[in-house]
């Protein structure tokens, strides 16, 4: 399926597959390496998509703990997936679907359901061929309509959970033409105490990979600095790859510089030559350069943003961090995010919040830390600090307004306090009978109608927007009239559902909340309107009247 309405897909090229595995340890940056390769191929004129393989038994990431796993990223079709798919969407500027995330739980569930329905005609159902065949089918279907599909295998080579996937890739390589398959292995190259780059971990990792029947075509060394030529030659010799197939991916402060760095190494050109598509690439002077222009521009200032939440793992709010960074790219400023723990709103954290230029309260679940979020929202509202509330942040803004403006002292969300006498946030009607947790929220892209002559209309440049949702609760319709009579404007709606709230310019320079998650559609080259407006308010522009770049959401 094409990933975009307009595609550069050339069926005469056939489909090309790049498999990316990792060794030595997890968290090396396989996803960023893969996404950067895809970005460069897209710059060269190819239509590129990606698949992330997660070897866990969960069907999706929807019920995973953000403290341990990081954020749950939501796709346009409602798929709740690993945060790496967010990186692929941002780097490749595509909209992916749940089919682009392959999990062990999803695969096993499908095979078992087929067995129960008699599709296997009484045969013994086994890992090989039934599970491996299903894995290969999923990869091919996700790649349909694209020139290149990049498949990242989560985890580390040697993990028992990943064995069926590596076997499926071994079979896949035999079933496709040699020119259509490329194996990239990302591995750690640490320094010894005497400053020598050590290749032994890479050698052992490749040995493990080869024992499974896979020979890498490209090796990418993750190191604090670039690999020196002696290190590359040694890795090439002992791992049986040409020296020119060994590339560096050193540490950087900003992941958006990685495509530029691996381009300097010549990774993209080598990939195109190995896949026999170099002759089809755009000439270098005709390739997309906006990415390079954005990430290398000299910024003209700094903005301090307080992010008030309860998850102290930065990855739990990855898309919010990235959306703020994208807005900074558009406004040509550096955005420094100050973490404020909403569970510990002591003097230290309160001071960090008060010293910030703007306040963002992101989404989340559970009662812990909500009073700290409400306190932060009140501070922003009463002191004219630019404010953006997302999902739960939107709901807590309603609670704060009900308590401190409507004088409903005990107002709260029914999700967080079942016995509240004023449930200004209540469960969605269709959620009453639902008991299962996984995949049952209001999920995915939904259209919001925007009132004319509002802050939201100015930000989005039109009368509607389509953004991604992930929630079970909404503003209680019984309180809407009272809230609006007291000055809180609901400027965006989906039928009877309140989707956007704001205060007018006479009450606040920038106070807006969204029930949806605009951060999931933000891109480095196409920043999210509410985040751009937040920075405009800090920088002295009036987002209520400023002409922001119209974004097709």
From Swiss-Prot:
Glutamine amidotransferase type-1 domain: residues covered: 307-544
Chain sites annotated for binding Mg(2+): 84, 152
Enzyme Commission code(s) on record: 6.3.4.2
Record organism: Haloarcula marismortui (strain ATCC 43049 / DSM 3752 / JCM 8966 / VKM B-1809) (Halobacterium marismortui)
Keyword Metal-binding carried by entry: yes
Matching PROSITE patterns: GATASE_TYPE_1 (PS51273)
A GO molecular-function descriptor: identical protein binding
Residues of the active site: 391 (nucleophile), 517, 519
GO biological process: 'de novo' CTP biosynthetic process; pyrimidine nucleobase biosynthetic process
Family: Belongs to the CTP synthase family.
The protein's name: CTP synthase
Pfam families (alphabetical): CTP_synth_N, GATase
Binding residues annotated for L-glutamine, in chain numbering: 364, 392-395, 415, 472
Assembly with partners or alone: Homotetramer.
Reported function: Catalyzes the ATP-dependent amination of UTP to CTP with either L-glutamine or ammonia as the source of nitrogen. Regulates intracellular CTP levels through interactions with the four ribonucleotide triphosphates.
Binding-site positions, CTP: 26, 159-161, 198-203, 234
Activity control summary: Allosterically activated by GTP, when glutamine is the substrate; GTP has no effect on the reaction when ammonia is the substrate. The allosteric effector GTP functions by stabilizing the protein conformation that binds the tetrahedral intermediate(s) formed during glutamine hydrolysis. Inhibited by the product CTP, via allosteric rather than competitive inhibition.
Pathway assigned to this chain's UniProt record: Pyrimidine metabolism; CTP biosynthesis via de novo pathway; CTP from UDP: step 2/2
Region described as Amidoligase domain: spans on this chain: 1-277
Catalytic reaction(s) noted: UTP + L-glutamine + ATP + H2O = CTP + L-glutamate + ADP + phosphate + 2 H(+); L-glutamine + H2O = L-glutamate + NH4(+); UTP + NH4(+) + ATP = CTP + ADP + phosphate + 2 H(+)
